[in-house]
């Protein structure tokens, strides 16, 4: 019983520490916007703010790859890839177009 209690408490403490060491993130896992250092900040503080702001903007605007990109030509069916001729018509381009 004492061994089980010791293992459980060690597991809970290690989980708690691991959660505390995670970087702070906002809603839906987005990073928090950096705080503006103020109008009277030193050039070093402004440079650090600029670096953090650039990283924040790049994180929010980076292109997303993966599942969303793969679902473009599936017709709503998972695991099925449709040819351009069987896809729903988008414009007036015929199926025998040389670029399709």
From Swiss-Prot:
Posttranslational mods: No icosapeptide-like peptide is cleaved from the C-terminal.
Main location: secreted
GO cellular component: cytoplasm; extracellular space
GO MF entries: G protein-coupled receptor binding; hormone activity
Pfam families: Hormone_3
Keyword Signal belongs to the record: yes
Tyrosine amide: modified positions: 65
UniProt entry keywords in alphabetical sequence: Amidation, Cleavage on pair of basic residues, Hormone, Secreted, Signal
Signal peptide feature range: 1-29
Family: Belongs to the NPY family.
Protein name in UniProt: Pancreatic polypeptide prohormone
